[in-house]
Amino acid sequence: MKKEELRLIFMGTADFAVPALRALVENGYQVKAVVTMPDKPMGRGHKVSPSMVKLYAQELGLPILQPDNLNEESFLDELRTYQPHLQIVVAFRMLPRSVWQMPPMGTINLHGSLLPMYRGAAPINHAIRHGDTETGVTTFRLRHEIDTGEVLLQEKLPIGHEETFGELYERMATLGASVLVHTVDLFLEGEPVSIPQEQLPGYVDARPAPKIFKDDCRIDWDKPAEEVHNFIRSISPAPTAWTKLHRPRMESIVLKIYRTQVIEREPRHRGRFGSIIWDKKNLDVMTRKGVIRILSLQMPGKKQMDAASFLNGFALSSDMYIE
């Protein structure tokens, strides 16, 4: 089959999916329609906004479907009118069987980990949180159980020791787009070979990657410095690690922490975890084992700033601590 004969449906919402959609179109594939979530209120003003995928699909002039319910018969009927050979899912939502079984070639998914490791909604975050030095992307055949389908292609990617979620996210989206195009290329040649995840290395010890909520983002300083550092960078810039600065006889302040550095892995300073060590330029916090240097943070109602700017405008005292 030729590229121009292969009818594709693309399903995605988050900006992670945009490079994949762009790559398919730029490589000559015929995306007949794009399925994305309905517009919803976003940001402080709760302004109703479209997804990034919808905005890009509008630029391309592609038909856009935004069903509230993926099981609605009207949506299924409209999807059938495009007679897709293959459906592609990137950063979307769980599909009912009636949708993913529709095309004769099936439905494939792009996932931000080396499956079977980190099945779930937040694979990039969890790879950083666990201190992994390598991750990657996987394309696989969709089936009902989340992220369990047979693997088509995988490609590895190193993780920098100081790399944040936001930085790795962008690199993963770019790599994922390339791997996805190569995967679709395989379908032009016939039925691609796929491997059950049970046969892949690490299947028995695979970690899950559940969605991360705001309540999960509070920093626990009663952990080794390396773990605290990995936790903070795993959710920077969003949903963002936070902690409380306690001030005697005053209300505590919530601080968002964006970037840190481990300056002591073995404790040389004495003191309780959460104790603050500072001078004119540096803001350090003791952990259970070692010391973390805060490089970038944010106070309520203020913009993100470096530690020196914070110290210049905020008077710390020896009876304050972080928790």
UniProtKB/Swiss-Prot annotation:
InterPro entries attached to this UniProt entry: Fmt, Formyl_trans_C, Formyl_transf_N, Formyl_transf_N_sf, Formyl_transferase-like_C_sf, Met-tRNA-FMT_C, Met-tRNA-FMT_N
Q: Name one GO molecular function term.
A: methionyl-tRNA formyltransferase activity
Q: Which Pfam families match?
A: Formyl_trans_C (PF02911), Formyl_trans_N (PF00551)
> This protein is called what?
Methionyl-tRNA formyltransferase
| PANTHER family, per database record | METHIONYL-TRNA FORMYLTRANSFERASE, METHIONYL-TRNA FORMYLTRANSFERASE, MITOCHONDRIAL
The EC designation for this entry is 2.1.2.9
Which Gene3D superfamilies does this UniProt record tie to the protein? 3.40.50.12230
Top enzyme category: transferase
- Show the GO cellular component annotation of the record: cytosol
Domain of life of the native organism: Bacteria
The record's section on SUPFAM superfamilies has: FMT C-terminal domain-like, Formyltransferase
Q: Does the keyword Protein biosynthesis apply?
A: yes
Give residues annotated as binding (6S)-5,6,7,8-tetrahydrofolate.
113-116
Sorted UniProt keywords: Protein biosynthesis, Transferase
Tagged with keyword Transmembrane helix: no
The function of this protein is: Attaches a formyl group to the free amino group of methionyl-tRNA(fMet). The formyl group appears to play a dual role in the initiator identity of N-formylmethionyl-tRNA by promoting its recognition by IF2 and preventing the misappropriation of this tRNA by the elongation apparatus.
Q: Which family does it belong to?
A: Belongs to the Fmt family.
Q: Which chemical reaction does it catalyze?
A: L-methionyl-tRNA(fMet) + (6R)-10-formyltetrahydrofolate = N-formyl-L-methionyl-tRNA(fMet) + (6S)-5,6,7,8-tetrahydrofolate + H(+)
